[in-house]
UniProtKB/Swiss-Prot annotation:
Technological use: Notoamides have been shown to exhibit antitumoral activities. Notoamides A-C show moderate cytotoxicity against HeLa and L1210 cells with IC(50) values in the range of 22-52 mg/ml, but the IC(50) value of notoamide D is greater than 100 mg/ml. Moreover, notoamide C induces G2/M-cell cycle arrest at a concentration of 6.3 mg/ml.
Gene Ontology MF annotations: FAD binding; monooxygenase activity
Biological process terms in GO annotation: alkaloid metabolic process
Listed name of the protein: FAD-dependent monooxygenase notI
Keyword Flavoprotein: yes
Catalytic residue positions: R195
Gene: notI
Source species: Aspergillus sp. (strain MF297-2)
Record-listed E.C. numbers: 1.-.-.-
Amino acid sequence: MAIDGSGVATPAPSGITVIIVGLGPTGLAAAIECHRRGHKVICFEKNPKSYRLGDLISVTGNAVRVLQEWGNGSVIKELQAFQCNLDTLEVYNETGDLKLSAPYNATQAKDEYMLRRSRLLDIFLQHLKSLGVEIHLGIQVADYWETESSAGVTVGGEKIVGDCVVVADGVHSKGRPQVSGEPFALEATDGIAFRAFFNASEISQDPEASWILRDAGEKDCFKTFYGKGLVMMVGTAENHEYVFWSCGHKENVMAHPSSVATVLDLIRDWPVSTRLAPLISKTPGDNCLNQTLYTRPPLKKWVSSNGRMIVLGDAAHPFLPHAGQGANQGIEDGAVLALCLEITSKKDVPLALRVTEKLRYQRVAAIQQRGVEARDQSLNVDWGNGGFSKKLTLHPAWLHDHDCIKQVYEEFDKAADAVTKGHEHTFGGIPVG
């Protein structure tokens, strides 16, 4: 490998061209990891810019193991610079009584970074651009295709040719049916989420709304309010430069044209709404997003018939937000694929994609189930009977301590055996017992 001016090793070309559709966390991670492994990367994203609505996102230890290799550690340093500066995580009931206060030291958190979703995407995208990768923003892919020796996409009537295609276009994936052969089917859960993020200047001059800034002091704060069938989170980010809130409801409610009005209606019977409502009502109209929560049974297969197209991230395995792993598992997906392609080389790209599926399938299915359990816990809090009906381990080792790169090296041959000979195997990264 050669060393570039920044001191980062430049990978030797593998001869493999990877086309990536979708530049959310999964697509960005796949693009960066594929470049790190020496593959040529061509990216397409339908949105013209990287900004996304949303709230906070946590990058956990299992994903940090991948990110720490990017840019000779520069990407991790950026995450550290923009993470929430928290001392405690506070839990309240619907009357506003503090029920739990857990210490949280952002500088000593175990390989975990909590930050704005849009900031995370921008950090990833800027790093990808710095690598000189071919990126096309604001471009809609019209079609996907493959032969025995190549795969590609059709854009503006032109066929773009590669060795494989990664479909990472999210939960409402347009490419998933063509790759998996399964119909576009999502199951709406019994819930809806509202998310908002806006500049703190929107509330700073309102004494009834700016209490969250006073509570944060010189740092940030994160407060969660639990009621029957409803959970509300509010807080600040980037040293209270930004305010966020999110609301999860057990039922699929009919949203008003303004999602803010819907949330105000949901919490109107909470005694603590006298504090929350002034803050929520200050949300700029275009800064609130309402989302029906979706999941779906695991796809029967992630890889196309000829083995040259694969769905990854939410396109393959959407998680409920309660799992706290959507972006993290997408990052793992991208890293595993890139390494599998490096191991097989250009001569056996289909094997690399199928091994990726084998190594990832059991793990993400287990995490999907954990998300369902976490949802049930958070939306069924009964403070009169002890609060949470079931205690979930906050940072289980099988989830947060998993090393997806190490797993590839240790289990590639076993996964290849499962692919080529049809043998059944259990792979790492799942709960034991």
